[in-house]
């Protein structure tokens, strides 16, 4: 998706505040068959799911029949749902936050705590390590490793801005930051903690703040940054 498509999608999407309510009381007296509410009631206890503006009105109108409740709510007026992970041919660990309209290639790995925003692209065989942030439209190629805590900056506004592009076979070290509009060339390595403020050519190592080329990729560097395919393979039944 380009930036204008994303902006239009967010603007036109229905904003939602979903809630989950554990409820106790004289529940048989309440009409749960209402649009926007799903109820699972057994006797005088149950769980209901729905949009807060609908659920709150129903609960307010039936206060006398409700003895107690506990409400769970994790968002307000949310414009973008999370990505439906079923059917994605990749390893996605618990706690990763991936929004809708993200593309994930086959055999990619998304680790715990990673956050991937709308419009991002994760290439085949790429590993997104723990607590990585991939901003809107961030584009990462095939067989990359993005180290723990790294930030791939996103660009949705201004719409004319170019997103970050990480080409194939790139290794980004832990806690490195790649700023908006930067391209990191194929086969390069960004050292841990580096802040990348200008394009990186292919097959070099950059380090520092701001990041500068310190050497070309050699065999020693390749062995230290080897991508292990076994970590990315999925055993099919």
Curated annotation (Swiss-Prot):
One of its GO terms (molecular function) is tetrahydrodipicolinate N-acetyltransferase activity. The keyword Nuclease does not apply. The keyword Repeat applies. Keywords: Acyltransferase, Amino-acid biosynthesis, Diaminopimelate biosynthesis, Lysine biosynthesis, Repeat, Transferase. InterPro entries: DapH (IPR019873), DapH_N (IPR013710), Hexapep (IPR001451), Hexapep_transf_CS (IPR018357), Trans_hexapeptide_repeat (IPR050179), Trimer_LpxA-like_sf (IPR011004). Transmembrane segments: none annotated. It is an enzyme of class 2 (transferase). It catalyses: (S)-2,3,4,5-tetrahydrodipicolinate + acetyl-CoA + H2O = L-2-acetamido-6-oxoheptanedioate + CoA. One of its GO terms (biological process) is diaminopimelate biosynthetic process. Belongs to the transferase hexapeptide repeat family. DapH subfamily. This is 2,3,4,5-tetrahydropyridine-2,6-dicarboxylate N-acetyltransferase. It comes from Alkaliphilus metalliredigens (strain QYMF). The gene is dapH.
